[in-house]
A protein has these predicted regions:
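N-terminal secretory signal peptides
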Residues: 1-13, 17-28
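Short boundary/loop segments of OB/S1/cold-shock single-stranded nucleic-acid-binding domains
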Residues: 32-45
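Structural detector for short beta-strands of small beta-barrel domains
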Residues: 46-59
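Short aromatic-glycine-enriched beta-strand elements
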Residues: 60-67
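A short macromolecule-binding patch
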Residues: 72-80
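Short nucleic-acid-contacting surface segments enriched for D/E, G, S/T with interspersed K/R
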Residues: 86-101
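Short, surface-exposed secondary-structure boundary micro-motifs
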Residues: 105-106
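OB-fold/S1-family single-stranded nucleic acid-binding modules
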Residues: 109-128
Length: 129
């Protein structure tokens, strides 16, 4: 292989690598923005929901509840599990069928989606933020 052919191949690989890296960066940035973009929630409107836990995840990046209320079912975004545990809220406290009160901000566009600021379970209030 001649020197000029090697340069063309090296340039081609460099361009492909650069494009692949750029594409991966954009995907990662979009995912991070989608998850961490709390601006979609209306912090000027605080809601207080009372209901029963119908489903729960206690996983990273944050826990989630499905809360059945008199007005319908809500999806509740909680804090990361490590923060909840550090503040005294365990996975066991969020068992299915448990009554809970959640205060937080509704999503501006998605109906019945809330970012929780605090949760009350069995008379214990846990600050999530």
């Amino acid at each position: 292989m001649r020197m000029s052919e090697r340069k063309i191949i090296a340039r081609s690989l460099s361009r492909r690598s650069a494009l692949a890296l750029a594409a991966a960066s954009l995907v990662g940035a979009k995912a991070a923005h989608a998850h961490h973009g709390w601006s979609g929630f209306d912090s000027g409107q605080v809601l207080r929901l009372n209901g029963r836990i119908a489903a729960m995840t206690f996983d990273n990046p944050h826990g989630e509840l499905r809360l059945t209320t008199a007005g319908g079912e809500w999806s509740i975004e909680l804090a990361p599990p490590s923060r909840m545990v550090a503040r005294g809220l365990s996975r066991e406290m969020l068992a299915l069928g448990t009554d809970a009160t959640v205060e937080g901000y509704p999503h501006r566009q998605t109906a019945r989606l809330m970012r929780a600021e605090r949760i009350v379970v069995a008379g214990k209030t846990t600050e999530l933020r």
